Amino acid sequence: SHSYAGGPSVYRTAIDDPSLEAAGLRLLEALDWHGPAMVEFKYDPVDGEFYLMEINPRFWGSLALPVTAGVDFPKLYYELATGGVDEPAFDYETGVGCHLLIGELSYLYSILTDDYAFIEKPALLPELVAIGRSVVTEPQFDYLALDDPRPFLCKLGALACELPSLTRDLLAGPLTS
């Protein structure tokens, strides 16, 4: 669920942090892992440190970001598996952002419908403006591409099927947790 209380990321930015890369590689080498993997760290603003969250032996949900930034991991994996490339290049553009648009909408919807006792609810209008501005200035999306709109249309179709229950929830008022 993409809620103001937390959940999967809906907007990501490509950064370059050699210390995180080195830490992730050390973990994968210690596991003798070969193949795609996601090593996730979470930043703690209190102490300024990154902490390991999880290691998943698969491609990750936010795969559109590195592809948009210039590293097509699925293609590289295919090329490595078929002998098409000996040493892959991982040069990418930092500062590139990518949206999960359905997640952004779900986040805004949660502001209207959810109520969490220990988490301050953000104001809808500033969040709507911030997301709108970000979508205009960083128009890269996980499922929405003008040259291949079908994945986004499928997601939109699935959302349309949920519309009756979403409307019912909205009219019922905030959910409390």
Predicted regions span which residues?
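Secondary-structure boundary/capping residues
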Residues: P36, A64, D86-E87
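Short acidic-glycine loop/turn motifs at beta-strand connectors
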Residues: P45-D47, T82-G83
